[in-house]
């Protein structure tokens, strides 16, 4: 969220104090009307005996205050900035009744924070500080209260009335209105409050828990979208079953609801028992969603459901502890998706995909001006801290804990965490302590104070590795060293605890040694005896720590790892290193040339290594697709001291062109072998086959552009027209667009005509064009033209992200134009968005924080 004028108060973690008052119960009554919603808030409040007596300060924003009563009597109050201050309150420790009546205008709430209207339905978003836009309150996560909510609205217009917890009463009122009363049996902070009202339909499923309890699961959507909710429901059922099986955490409500809305700033929100989702993470059908969409829905449904325990039952003491719930829950959703994937190879693919996100999004954040620890020490605006560091790096910190105590030990630690803290608002320290205390003999327990540097220090550590082989003694020594560069406000870094999973490979592919070493000092040396020949070290297997590995592999060593390593992650990593090495060399050679791709030649050993992967009968298609995809332009840029986005783009495109031309026959064979996956199912095996077929098509279209061949573009266009599922259709369309073929234009027009009524599919259509390779500076004019398209609406966050973010944040070669026109466009859009939705504007502003 961009800073408002005059907003300069820095909040410090070290200055945390408990609230001066506790709120035990909240009884909210809403008379819902888009133009004027009335909110009656009755609270049972008591002084906190541990804090010196002081006035009660309640947060509120954009509210019209009508009355304030204490124990049924009028009372004096004053406004200080955005706070309602009450000084004349009953003395002593007895609880008192506080009643506040306010009104607000949901129809004018374009920020989509608090209570707002979308498609003639009411929705809420309260995390982090949205509840204060609904009523005056102690809007902080350590104030946990029991909520009763009564909703009243016009029945014909808003037939469905939902809130947190269990429905206890509903009925008709006069004048065509009706009501519903909801009681949440669990205490919660205000950020987990939610209400929904509107014309919605739902898919229902009754389930029975392991303990024999019955639960009702519901997925609510707009009429017409019900046929796209089956996968979301299946994902929810799988999430409930998995959390109970893996961690012994059952569903604790009679019903659990998901509601989808197309106007949503986030991906989804874990409000207790009433999750509100962006439609992007609920709606899917074979015709409208790709394999990636299906996988994302499974992951996000899991993530929000898992918050029911890690975030809701145990919440954050303050917002500095955000990773307590988010890092842990990202880890849980990653484990869920890996467990559902089943096969070891599919688990490895999921792990590689997660690491790819971390390295292309989080590593740059750690290396830039926005670098901050997983648990920040200060903030100006909390909404700006919903970052890949807090989420994805936070998940890696939790994963290292599991590595250090073992999977069973981690489950024991989770059980102790809930035993100690259920119903409380706690800290990252409390969580780490519980995992360590449950495993007193573990290295985590022994190293806990040092391990917590992962929470307090920003930046990505670099781990150096130097091997030496003594042929006479048959001894191999491996020296490891760690270093972390200064980050803003943290010039000196203390050593981290780095779990290093390793193996030693012989040149013929035999594994000579394997194990786990925990690096705790600046340098450390490992010695291996009876090693018959000079080994190739395979380090940080499975990406056992979120660090950058600095080691001088030869090409032959990398080719050995790519061919033989038993760790799939390091096989993939070897291919990435081979490609990266060539990209960096070519960028240096071609930095002053305008079109590097035309002059570029790749060496035969590299091409043959890729060819052998493509031909390997024992490797999964999904794994091949990952290995054969070059490092992203963003990741390449991170390896360079001087970044020239145009040169990076030209070299990467030139490398793709060479791989397309030199491996053309193999790409044809791969496409023919994987083009038909039978009846559609988004499982890992079939998804991997479609992904490899799509990658093959994109290379065949690239080769055709160079050779003048018309056959493969024609086949691709036919594939686009005939495809029975969105994955194959969109892969074909992407191949035509990314190769710059003339058939891209009719294909884009046909795609729009087919899906003009499907909002999420149109988002793909806009995104594909905003993210297209820039051949001659034509992407920005295309983006400006698309902003005038009748289907473009900048006020819808999904649509704004699809076009503007795809260009500014995901297309560096096109965005960082030498004439700065990309920056002009970016600044115009940030200012335009900030006028009505500061949160989306703040996200866009970060396109330039690297």
Name each model-derived stretch.
Residues 1-38, 116-125, 137, 141, ...:
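N-terminal, polar/Ser/Thr-rich
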Residues 40, 44-62, 136-139, 145-154, ...:
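Surface-exposed beta-strand/loop patches in extracellular or lumenal glycoproteins
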Residues 41-45, 60, 94-109, 147-155, ...:
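Short, hydrophobic/aromatic-enriched beta-strand segments in well-ordered soluble domains
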Residues 48-118, 139, 174-176, 519-534:
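A surface-exposed beta-strand-loop module
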Residues 50, 64-71, 444-449, 460-539, ...:
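Beta-strand-rich binding/interaction modules
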Residues 101-204, 567-572:
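Extended, low-hydrophobicity, Ser/Thr/Pro/Gly-biased non-transmembrane segments
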Residues 182, 213-472, 477-478:
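Hydrophobic alpha-helical and helix-loop surface patches within well-folded domains
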Residues 360, 387, 529-850:
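Long, ordered, helix-rich scaffold segments
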């Amino acid at each position: 969220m961009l800073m408002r004028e005059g907003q300069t108060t820095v909040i410090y973690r070290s200055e945390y104090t408990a609230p001066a008052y506790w709120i035990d119960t909240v009884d909210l009554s809403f008379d819902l009307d888009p133009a004027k919603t009335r909110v009656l808030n009755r609270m049972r409040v008591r002084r906190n005996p541990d804090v010196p007596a002081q006035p009660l300060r309640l947060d509120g924003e954009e509210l019209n205050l009508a009355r304030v009563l204490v124990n049924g009597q009028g009372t004096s109050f004053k406004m200080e900035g955005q706070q309602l201050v009450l000084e004349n309150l009953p003395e002593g420790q007895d609880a008192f009744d506080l009643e506040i009546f306010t009104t607000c205008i949901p129809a004018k709430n374009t920020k989509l924070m608090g209570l707002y209207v979308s498609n003639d339905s009411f929705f809420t978003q309260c995390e982090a500080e949205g509840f204060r836009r609904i009523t005056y309150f102690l809007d902080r996560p350590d104030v946990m209260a029991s909520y009763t909510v009564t909703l009243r609205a016009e029945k014909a217009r808003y037939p469905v009335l939902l809130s947190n917890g269990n429905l206890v009463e509903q009925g008709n009122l006069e004048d065509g209105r009706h009501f519903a009363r909801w009681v949440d049996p669990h205490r919660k902070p205000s950020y987990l409050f939610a209400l929904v009202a509107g014309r919605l339909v739902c898919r229902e499923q009754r389930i029975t828990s392991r303990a024999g309890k019955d639960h009702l699961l519901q997925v609510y959507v707009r009429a017409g979208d019900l046929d796209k909710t089956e996968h979301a429901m299946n994902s929810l059922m799988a999430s409930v079953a998995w959390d109970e099986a893996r961690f012994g955490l059952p569903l604790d409500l009679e019903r659990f609801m998901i509601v989808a809305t197309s106007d949503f700033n986030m991906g989804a929100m874990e409000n207790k028992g009433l999750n509100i989702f962006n439609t992007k993470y609920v709606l899917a059908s074979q015709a409208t969603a790709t394999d990636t969409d299906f996988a994302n829905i499974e992951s996000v449904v899991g993530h929000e459901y898992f918050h029911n325990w890690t975030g809701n039952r145990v919440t954050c003491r303050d917002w500095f502890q955000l990773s307590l719930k988010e890092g842990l829950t990202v880890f849980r959703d990653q484990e869920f998706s890996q467990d559902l994937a089943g096969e070891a190879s599919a688990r490895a693919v999921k792990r590689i995909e997660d690491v790819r996100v971390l390295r292309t999004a989080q590593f740059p954040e750690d290396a830039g001006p926005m670098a901050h620890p997983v648990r920040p020490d200060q903030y100006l605006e909390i909404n700006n801290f919903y970052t890949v560091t807090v989420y994805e790096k936070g998940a890696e910190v939790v994963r290292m804990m599991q590595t250090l105590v073992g999977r069973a030990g981690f489950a024991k630690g989770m059980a102790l965490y809930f035993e100690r803290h259920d119903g409380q608002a706690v800290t990252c320290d409390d969580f780490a302590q519980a995992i360590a205390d449950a495993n007193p003999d573990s290295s985590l327990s022994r190293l806990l104070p040092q391990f917590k540097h992962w929470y307090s220090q920003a930046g990505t550590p670099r781990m150096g590795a130097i091997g030496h082989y003594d042929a006479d003694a048959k001894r191999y020594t491996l020296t490891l060293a760690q270093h972390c560069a200064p980050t803003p406000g943290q010039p000196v870094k203390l050593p981290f605890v780095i779990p290093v999973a390793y193996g030693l490979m012989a040149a013929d592919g035999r594994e000579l040694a394997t194990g786990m070493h925990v690096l705790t000092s600046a340098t450390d040396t490992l010695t291996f005896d009876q090693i018959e020949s000079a080994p190739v070290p395979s380090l940080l297997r499975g990406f056992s720590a979120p660090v950058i590995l600095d080691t001088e592999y030869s090409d032959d060593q990398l080719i050995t790892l790519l061919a033989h390593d038993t760790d799939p992650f390091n096989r993939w990593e070897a291919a990435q290193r081979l490609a990266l090495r060539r990209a960096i060399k070519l960028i240096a050679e071609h930095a002053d040339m305008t079109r590097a791709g035309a002059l570029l030649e790749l060496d035969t050993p590299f091409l043959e290594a890729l060819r052998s992967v493509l031909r390997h009968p024992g490797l999964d298609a999904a794994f091949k697709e990952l290995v054969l995809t070059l490092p992203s332009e963003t990741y390449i840029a991170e390896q360079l001291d001087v970044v020239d986005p145009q040169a990076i783009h030209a070299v990467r495109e030139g490398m793709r062109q060479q791989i397309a031309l030199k491996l053309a026959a193999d790409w044809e064979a791969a496409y023919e072998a994987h083009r038909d996956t039978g009846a559609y199912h988004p499982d890992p095996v079939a998804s991997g086959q479609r992904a490899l077929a799509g990658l093959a098509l994109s290379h065949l279209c690239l080769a055709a552009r160079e050779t003048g061949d018309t056959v493969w573009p024609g086949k691709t266009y036919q594939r686009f027209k005939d495809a029975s599922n969105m994955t194959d259709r969109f892969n074909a369309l992407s191949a035509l667009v990314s190769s710059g073929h003339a058939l891209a234009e009719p294909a884009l027009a046909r795609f729009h005509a087919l899906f003009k009524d499907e909002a999420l599919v149109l988002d793909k259509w806009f995104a594909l064009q905003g993210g297209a390779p820039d051949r001659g500076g034509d992407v920005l004019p295309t983006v400006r033209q698309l902003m005038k398209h009748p289907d473009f609406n900048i006020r819808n966050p999904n649509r704004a992200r699809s076009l503007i973010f795809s260009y500014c944040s995901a297309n560096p070669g096109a965005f960082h134009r030498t004439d700065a026109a990309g920056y002009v466009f970016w600044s115009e859009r940030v200012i335009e968005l900030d006028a009505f939705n500061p949160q989306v504007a703040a996200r866009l502003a970060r396109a330039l924080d690297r």
